[in-house]
Amino acid sequence: MKICEKCFNNTEIVEIIANDNSKFDNCDIDNDHLGVKIFDTTKDIDKLELIRDYLRPALELYDISINLPDTFSLKEGKKIEIALKDDWSIFNVEEAQISCILNELFKDDENLDRRVLEDLVGAKIINDKKYTNK
């Protein structure tokens, strides 16, 4: 899958994608992203790993709702793509496209609990009293 620099707001990820040896092509994520610098998830394995390594810490801030403390309300649970869009400025595309990107990037990653990409999640740190005023 071809993912482009315009799919991201994060400058570090944009730099990974847009480095000197990047190819120009059309993005598979957003049909409006034409003639842009892309990386192919099936060919550019080094870039894939760099982007995974950059995104993984943000994903690890979240846990599936059944693993969160009793103080966590299930009503607070969100899909990861919504949580990331609400809490961070990593992506420059809509939730469905974020989901597609995450599923493509992490489809064979054994270091990530796939349930984070599929189930409702909550941020672990939000419910930890030592980090909040709650």
Predicted regions and their residues:
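Intrinsically disordered, low-complexity terminal and linker regions
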Residues: 1-134
